[in-house]
Amino acid sequence: MKFLLDILLLLPLLIVCSLESFVKLFIPKRRKSVTGEIVLITGAGHGIGRLTAYEFAKLKSKLVLWDINKHGLEETAAKCKGLGAKVHTFVVDCSNREDIYSSAKKVKAEIGDVSILVNNAGVVYTSDLFATQDPQIEKTFEVNVLAHFWTTKAFLPAMTKNNHGHIVTVASAAGHVSVPFLLAYCSSKFAAVGFHKTLTDELAALQITGVKTTCLCPNFVNTGFIKNPSTSLGPTLEPEEVVNRLMHGILTEQKMIFIPSSIAFLTTLERILPERFLAVLKRKISVKFDAVIGYKMKAQ
């Protein structure tokens, strides 16, 4: 009973906050400067990571690029240098905790304190549970979420000491809405979203106001990782569009970025709609892509 009374007493504050949020919709958000910031991007040798590096290079940030693919990493670095940025590259296996920690130690010793961390590296296996091998499940979690713990543990202490920093989690719409035949991937992205939300709350509880957090949750992106994706929610997103939204979110310090915005509405519906209706709605959304179905093979 006391809890309900406390909630009722908060209603005036809810009205004020709602009005404040509505007014802010019509006021352009001020973008912060990232000139001279040391920006570390994992998975920088391809796709979203590469294009994000280009954008930070244009803004005169100092770049630290990590990827397991040396050739892709060098291509990204060359373009960033052509844009006038100072660039440092490290071949890092983000599924290996010790590799992350040793590389982080080199970054701090040779370059300085990372002030913007973009946890972007990711892997995906499109198959049902029967066809997904144990090492694939392990690697999915090691890269898609455990690496976020290790990089954040490595670089957050300096951010908190300086009360200045930004941690970016590249997750997915699949971290909010489940998709069949992406079981390991969805599970890891749900964990990544949970990591972002809990880290955000933990920083607030510790009153570390200068370290910001942002989480990116796009629908299917045309990066080649998932073959022939389609959904009635809209066309497959181009990486350039996603990175433009990501950069705007980082520079205006948005906490959660959904692309398209309808994903946010869908996540709300999932919490309130009857289960039977929700099943019909998911069939209408019609998510499709090429996948290996091990259940059929086992049944033969």
Swiss-Prot record:
GO terms for biological process: androgen catabolic process; estrogen biosynthetic process. Present at high level in steroidogenic cells such as syncytiotrophoblasts, sebaceous gland, Leydig cells, and granulosa cells of the dominant follicle and corpus luteum. In lung, it is detected in the ciliated epithelium and in acini of adult trachea, in bronchioles, but not in alveoli. In the eye, it is detected in the nonpigmented epithelium of the ciliary body and, at lower level, in the inner nuclear layer of the retina (at protein level). Widely expressed. Highly expressed in retina, pancreas, kidney, liver, lung, adrenal, small intestine, ovary and heart. CDD domains: 17beta-HSDXI-like_SDR_c. It is an enzyme of class 1 (oxidoreductase). Can convert androstan-3-alpha,17-beta-diol (3-alpha-diol) to androsterone in vitro, suggesting that it may participate in androgen metabolism during steroidogenesis. May act by metabolizing compounds that stimulate steroid synthesis and/or by generating metabolites that inhibit it. Has no activity toward DHEA (dehydroepiandrosterone), or A-dione (4-androste-3,17-dione), and only a slight activity toward testosterone to A-dione. Tumor-associated antigen in cutaneous T-cell lymphoma. Its EC number is 1.1.1.62. Belongs to the short-chain dehydrogenases/reductases (SDR) family. 17-beta-HSD 3 subfamily. The active site is at Y185 (proton acceptor). The keyword Ion transport does not apply. Coiled coil: none annotated. It comes from the Eukaryota. NADP(+) binds at residues 40-64. InterPro entries: NAD(P)-bd_dom_sf, SDR_fam. It catalyses: 17beta-estradiol + NAD(+) = estrone + NADH + H(+); 17beta-estradiol + NADP(+) = estrone + NADPH + H(+). GO terms for cellular component: cytoplasm; cytosol; endoplasmic reticulum; lipid droplet. One of its GO terms (molecular function) is steroid dehydrogenase activity. PANTHER family: ESTRADIOL 17-BETA-DEHYDROGENASE 11, PKSB. Residues 1-19 form the signal peptide. This is Estradiol 17-beta-dehydrogenase 11. The keyword Protease does not apply. Pfam families: adh_short. It comes from Homo sapiens. Substrate binds at S172. It is found in: Endoplasmic reticulum; Lipid droplet. Keywords: Endoplasmic reticulum, Lipid biosynthesis, Lipid droplet, Lipid metabolism, NADP, Oxidoreductase, Signal, Steroid biosynthesis.
